[in-house]
């Protein structure tokens, strides 16, 4: 079969798109973490610790930037998972009890814009689950949003607003986070060897 020049040009123009469609992948938290580490934070971070509680609250990825600031990234795989995040303790400052008229006490809670010691906060999720009405479900208007397309490429949909009052971490703290990062690495390596 001989193709005309026009048909050949058309075939060349559509080939990469057909190939890309065959590369559609399932977006998992592990894939999102890998893409964030290798593409977005590759040159902007000193340390990236998965599943870290160091800052006082759970972070799926805790990033220490080159200027010694913390970025907290939550990896979400469903809308329900994103909506539940608003209830996490890291988004609330709880103070003393307040007495009510009926004699019962309630705890005074104030919403926070950033988790404790965190400079920036992001939610990362597949683009397929994101709708613009989910902005109202975010625990903070300062949170950034990173969306992953069908091929697994991350794109910053909305930049995070920094907490200017968040302190830089000390070198000793950075060393402690590096130790945690290496412990996570060897834990994953052991799991990999046992499977």
Please place each PLM-identified region on the residue numbering:
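Active-site beta-strand-loop-beta-strand hairpin of nuclease catalytic cores
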Residues: 59-72, 76-78, 116
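Acidic-basic catalytic patches of nuclease active cores, encompassing PD-(D/E)XK
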Residues: 14-57, 64-66
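Surface-exposed, flexible loop/turn segments at secondary-structure boundaries
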Residues: 69, 80-81, 129, 151-153
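Catalytic cores of nucleic-acid endonucleases
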Residues: 77-143
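Non-catalytic C-terminal interaction segments of nucleic acid-processing enzymes
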Residues: 19, 27, 37-38, 130-195
């Amino acid at each position: 079969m001989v193709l005309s020049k026009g048909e050949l040009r058309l075939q060349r123009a559509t080939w990469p798109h057909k190939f890309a469609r065959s590369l559609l992948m399932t977006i998992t938290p592990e894939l999102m973490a890998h893409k964030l580490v290798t593409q977005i934070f590759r040159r902007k971070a000193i340390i990236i610790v998965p599943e870290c509680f160091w800052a006082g609250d759970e972070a799926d990825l805790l990033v220490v930037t080159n200027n010694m600031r913390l970025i907290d990234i939550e990896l979400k795989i469903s809308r329900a998972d994103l909506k539940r995040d608003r209830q996490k303790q890291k988004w609330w400052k709880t103070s003393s009890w307040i007495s009510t008229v009926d004699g019962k006490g309630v705890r005074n809670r104030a919403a926070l814009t950033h988790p404790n010691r965190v400079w920036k906060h992001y939610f990362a999720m597949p683009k397929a689950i994101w709708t613009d009405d989910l902005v109202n479900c975010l625990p903070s208007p300062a949170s950034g949003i990173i969306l992953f397309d069908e091929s697994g490429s991350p794109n910053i949909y909305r930049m995070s607003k920094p907490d200017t009052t968040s302190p830089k971490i000390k070198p000793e703290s950075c060393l402690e986070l590096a130790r945690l990062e290496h412990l996570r690495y060897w834990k994953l390596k052991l799991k990999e060897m046992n499977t």
